[in-house]
Amino acid sequence: MMKPWTVLQELEADNSRLKKEAIIKRESDADNKDFFDGVCMALDGFRTFGVQKVPTSTKDGAGLSQDIFDLVVRQLEERTLTGNDMRDRIDELCATATKEEWNDWYRRILIKDLRCGMTHKTVNKFSKYKVPVFDCMLATDSAKHEKKMVGEMIVEPKLDGVRVIVICDVDKDEVTLFSRNGKELLNFPEINKQFDEMLDQMSESMVFDGE
């Protein structure tokens, strides 16, 4: 069984779409669960870790097991590991892992960017492992649909800003901001704070979509 970081290196090294698809199918047929578990952690927009900065490894440690990493990821998802404790624990993981393990695998999962030119679409189409799809409604240029532009309609200016989808989860007592591509946004603390103050007034979980 190929190590997950070795598979990722192979995907990153080849720009061919067909080659990437073949690699994904090969690993799926080989039942490389560790690889696809990590891929799903990184590509699933609904799984967030609350991590802003993840260090790069500069020297080899003894090696980090997937089980230990998975345990920490679970704590990050449940927000039972936060703040300075989170930072210190991630630093410990970085020091424990080899450079190859950390920089080419574990770190990329935590920053939710595999950097290998592969999306959830490739995984879902060419493997038995599936990644939940984070999707939002997007506008289409009316110039491509002129025949539909008849009758009365409402027109508004096109906003030029940052698309933000806010998920207010009353069960988890948590507010999370996402980009249109499902990447967690951590650079709008004031917006997050405003929605967090509204959370106690909500009787059910809600989603807000805006620019």
Task: Give residue spans per PLM region.
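N-terminal nucleic-acid-engaging modules of covalent nucleotidyltransferase systems
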Residues: 1-211
